[in-house]
Structure formats: structure tokens, C-alpha cells
A protein has these predicted regions:
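Eukaryotic intrinsically disordered, low-complexity regulatory linkers and tails enriched in Ser/Thr/Pro
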Residues: 2-161
Length: 161
């Protein structure tokens, strides 16, 4: 009987500790986790609705270019997501560029692509026989990669400016 009481006491103590630790962890959240979100940018989607995007999450803006994308749209890549919008490339670049510094580069097909410099984590040379023949470099970010015509040196210089 004493062994059973002892086991129950230990179990009760463990439960109390677990509840205390969970409560303490909830109270000591990182300030960014409890801070209110900044201003959202609103874009008109292809279906006529609107989509709000946190500008801090945007990393790439370009016009659609592949056969599996809606023609004539603008692509905003953000936080591992993608939204296609009706607005012009110039309008989107102006709206985002007013909040986040954008750098303009050239896609292998010749179209412009705008990258948020702060999102760039690295630049590598294009891989022969794997990258597009017109690509000279690959811009790397946490969210993805973008092949461009500029050299790695030119990209590195542009990103630090």
C-alpha cells in the first residue's frame, strides 16, 4: 500500500511539474511571437478577390513565364507560398519596394525578376547541363532559388548595396 501511495505521489509531482513548465513556457514567449503583425500589403488576385501579404515574407516578384502559370499575371513568392495577381509588375514592385528594398535581375529568358536583397542567403554559379543555358548564377534564399543571367560577382555587389 505504501508503494502505491509513493507511486501516486511521484506521478502527481510529475504532473504538477509538467503543468508548471508548460505555463512558464507560455508566459516567456519570444517578443516576436506575441508582437502584433506589421502592415499587410493587399493585392488583387486573378479571381477578383484580394490577398493580404506580409511584406516581410516576400522574397521574389516576377511576371508569369511558364506554361503551367496563368498568362499575363504577376507572381509574388512569399513564405513558401505563391500568389498570382492582376496588378502590373511596375505597380507590385512600387508597392513592395516602398517597404522592402528590391534588386532587379534578369531571368534566363530575358524577363526581369525582383528579389528582396535581405532574403538572399547565397549566390552560386550556374550548373552546366543542369541550369538554363543563359543562366550564369543562382540566387539562393531560404524559400527557393532563382537562376539569372547576371554573374555571381555582379549579384553579390548588388545585394550588398
Amino acid at each position: 500500500m505504501d508503494a502505491m501511495k509513493s507511486s501516486l505521489s511521484v506521478l502527481a509531482l510529475l504532473c504538477l511539474c509538467l503543468v508548471s513548465w508548460t505555463t512558464a513556457a507560455g508566459e516567456e514567449r519570444h517578443p516576436a511571437a506575441i508582437a502584433p503583425q506589421g502592415a499587410q500589403l493587399t493585392f488583387q488576385t486573378l479571381d477578383g478577390n484580394t490577398q493580404q501579404v506580409n511584406p516581410d515574407e516576400i522574397w521574389r516578384i516576377r511576371a508569369t513565364s511558364t506554361s503551367d502559370e496563368p498568362p499575363g499575371a504577376i507572381v509574388i513568392d512569399y513564405a513558401f507560398e505563391r500568389v498570382y495577381v492582376k496588378e502590373s509588375l511596375a505597380s507590385v514592385v512600387e508597392k513592395v519596394g516602398g517597404i522592402r528594398p528590391l534588386k532587379k535581375f534578369t531571368l534566363p529568358g530575358g524577363a526581369p525578376v525582383y528579389i528582396v536583397a535581405a532574403k538572399v542567403t547565397g549566390v552560386t554559379r550556374a550548373i552546366p547541363h543542369q541550369s538554363h543555358p543563359n543562366a550564369h548564377a543562382i540566387i539562393v534564399s531560404r524559400e527557393g532559388q532563382t537562376q539569372v543571367q547576371e554573374t555571381p560577382e555582379a549579384i553579390s555587389e548588388a545585394v550588398v548595396k
